[in-house]
Amino acid sequence: MLELDIQRATDAAAPDDAAFRRWCELALRQRTADSEMTIRLVDEAEGRELNHTYRHKDYATNVLSFPADVPDDLLDIPLLGDLVICVAVVEREAAEQGKSLEAHWAHLVMHGCLHLLGYDHIEDEEAEEMEGLERELLAELGHPDPYADDETDTITH
């Protein structure tokens, strides 16, 4: 079971809680243990500050993933980690890339969840595996391949 805390730190329009739950549960279905995670929706100022603090990049990015990195058996809390999503960046990217807003939201939430599970895209082989999973998950929701029209990785972090 997924315990999901959604923190809306911005008044900007964003998907409803049910959509976030659906996307997270789909991305996390390979994890058999209970999971607890937080999604914090932020404005560009907070997104920029967090990206600068944790990644030394002076701009707001679409999604930041903070895995808990705590073994499940160490605590009685199945803490998976946190996602921070900058609403304005998601909206801007969807428009610039000609993607539906819902598909882009789904992609970024599931991308972040995969990071919480330990997937990464630093090395080419890792990126291929992670992007393949993202394509499969999005296809299950009826969304197109997020990388089809892009020669480079659309995830900015």
Curated annotation (Swiss-Prot):
PROSITE patterns: UPF0054 (PS01306). InterPro entries: MetalPrtase_cat_dom_sf_prd (IPR023091), YbeY (IPR002036), YbeY_CS (IPR020549). Belongs to the endoribonuclease YbeY family. GO terms for cellular component: cytoplasm. Keywords: Cytoplasm, Endonuclease, Hydrolase, Metal-binding, Nuclease, Ribosome biogenesis, rRNA processing, Zinc. It is found in: Cytoplasm. One of its GO terms (biological process) is rRNA processing. The lineage of its organism: Bacteria, Pseudomonadati, Pseudomonadota, Gammaproteobacteria, Pseudomonadales. Single strand-specific metallo-endoribonuclease involved in late-stage 70S ribosome quality control and in maturation of the 3' terminus of the 16S rRNA. The gene is ybeY. Its EC number is 3.1.-.-. Its main location: cytoplasm. This is Endoribonuclease YbeY.
